[in-house]
A protein has these predicted regions:
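Amphipathic alpha-helical interaction surfaces in cytosolic regulatory modules
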Residues: 17-43, 49-59, 63-110
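Short, Lys/Arg-enriched N-terminal segments with co-localized hydrophobic residues
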Residues: 1-8
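Short glycine-/polar-rich loops that comprise or flank the Walker A/P-loop
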Residues: 8-10, 94-95
Length: 132
């Protein structure tokens, strides 16, 4: 854990801790690899880590280690879904995460993540798990 001013940082590396090939929106979109979708990322990885954060903790999410690219459906469902399904407001989510990368090409994906979160409407949809 890294200590920054006022916050303890917990790390999550998408390429190492989730998948080097994340894709798709819903588990039902990918019957052969439902564990690599945005829905799986949000429900099985991101949401539990966010819920486990203390008041003085943030989640540092590394997006470029071992991952070549991201589709918009994965990013939207994986990140903005936290807001859309009412788990956190966009302000709460943005205050709890920091998107990190070392490859400057991934600045584009960071901007897309922040854009999707900003556009998400809080609790605009009820989450119903998709079937594979």
């Amino acid at each position: 854990m890294i200590q920054t001013i006022g916050y303890k940082m917990k790390k999550f590396n998408i390429g190492k801790d989730f998948s080097t090939d994340p894709f798709g929106r819903f588990r039902s979109d990918s019957p052969k690899s439902p564990e690599r979708t945005g829905e799986a990322f949000r429900e099985d990885y991101l949401k539990p880590r966010l819920e486990g954060l203390g008041l003085d903790e943030k989640l540092e999410i590394f997006i470029d280690d071992g991952v070549e690219s991201y589709g918009s459906s994965f990013l939207s469902e994986g990140f903005a879904g936290i807001v859309k399904y009412g788990y956190m407001t966009k302000e709460e989510l943005l205050s709890k995460i920091e998107i990190k990368f070392s490859n400057e090409d991934f600045e584009f994906f960071k901007k897309k993540i922040l854009e999707y979160i900003a556009q998400a409407k809080y609790k605009s949809k009820k989450y119903e798990p998709t079937n594979t």
